[in-house]
Amino acid sequence: MADKSHVNNVPMQGNGAYSSHAALQHEAMLKALPLFRAAAEAISKVDSTRVAIVEYGSAHGNNSLEPMEAILKSIHARSLELLFSDRPENDFCTLSKTVTEWADGLVENQLLHPLFISMIPRSFYQQVIPPKSAHLGFSLAALHHLDHVPQPTEDGQDESKLLQRQAHVDLATFLKLRSKEIVSGGSLILSFVGQASAGYENYGGPVDACRNAMIQMVQQDKIPVSVAQAFRVPTYNRTLSDVKKLMDEFTQIWKVHDLFEDDVMHPAFYELKIQSNPSQEASHKYAEIVIDWMMAVCSGYFTKALQVGSQGGYTKEEEESLLQDWVTRTKELFIRDHKDEEVICSFIYIRLERL
């Protein structure tokens, strides 16, 4: 069992903050909709009175609904079960509000299907639902998050190699678990952040600004070096080649219908570029948006680093103050060093059929 400080148990920023700052994830989801339509067409041919659709890693649910609607449009006169799952630490109150309001709207619009909704507080690196109980599963913008940070080995292996191996193990574990849960002929749709074949660094400007803001805080004795050393976001960006090699291990279980990568731009960049010469106000607004987007994912890991690196030496008020300091510095450094730069990310997309 991994040491608790290495376990990935940090949720996305709660109280609706993540859902309010997930525009890039929404853009990535839109590119996956054709895969959902293809999978829905296959489901429509299944001879079953009940169809179950499960999402692995729902967060607050704001990017779950359009894929669900794409599926529902192709399914007629059946009992539908929609299951939303995420780690126990997730903000299920926000998820419940998002999903309930959406479902109530469907019912008011005379949805033809009996609709049953469940939420499951369980990591997708564990079995989430009973065997052979789902017809379609999907996970969007989540699988680059690892189960835990691999600990250093005695022979001093390179950290990037350890992360690559952990990413391989985690994706293999995920596919094995889903193969138990999804019926033969069912579908699994995945999208996650990948390493761009074009060679660019994903959201390089915000990452650089975050890093330099933390260095600045250490240099000014705002935080000790131990906090900076404890800061880890347990992710790994797989290459398309990594994923293809892994899928070769599952040819008896999963059939690959689609496997490709695509670039996803933060939509705020398009809004900025509508202006031929963006004003200072527009540039500051852009910085606010893209850094708030990154912090919706990273802020919890900064707070965890404060707790681990100081061995619980900060009060909650001090943690909140230091977090706000880091966020403010990051925005200032983004404007100074990366003003108006595009924020782009490579995503890998997969559509699988359970054999």
Curated annotation (Swiss-Prot):
Domain of life, per lineage: Eukaryota
Q: Which UniProt keywords apply?
A: Magnesium, Metal-binding, Methyltransferase, S-adenosyl-L-methionine, Transferase
Taxonomic lineage of the native organism: Eukaryota, Fungi, Dikarya, Ascomycota, Pezizomycotina
KW Transmembrane (keyword) present: no
Q: Is Ligase included in the keywords of this UniProt record?
A: no
- Please give one Gene Ontology molecular function term for this protein: methyltransferase activity
Q: Which InterPro entries match?
A: MeTrfase_7, MeTrfase_capping, SAM-dependent_MTases_sf
Please give the organism: Gibberella moniliformis (strain M3125 / FGSC 7600)
Q: E.C. number, please?
A: 2.1.1.-
**Cofactor section:** Mg(2+)
Say which family it is in: Belongs to the methyltransferase superfamily. Type-7 methyltransferase family.
Binding of Mg(2+): at which residues? 231
- GO biological process: any one? methylation
Which residues are recorded as binding S-adenosyl-L-homocysteine?
Answer: 18, 63, 86, 123-124
Q: In which pathway does it act?
A: Mycotoxin biosynthesis
Functional description taken from the UniProt entry: Methyltransferase; part of the gene cluster that mediates the biosynthesis of the mycotoxin fusarin C. Within the cluster, FUS1, FUS2, FUS8 and FUS9 are sufficient for fusarin production. The roles of the other FUS members are yet undetermined. The fusarin C synthetase FUS1 is responsible for the condensation of one acetyl-coenzyme A (CoA) unit with six malonyl-CoA units and the amide linkage of the arising heptaketide and homoserine, subsequently releasing the first intermediate, prefusarin, as an alcohol with an open ring structure.
The free-text cofactor remark is: Binds 1 Mg(2+) ion per subunit.
Q: Which named protein is this?
A: Methyltransferase FUS9
Enzyme category, top tier: transferase
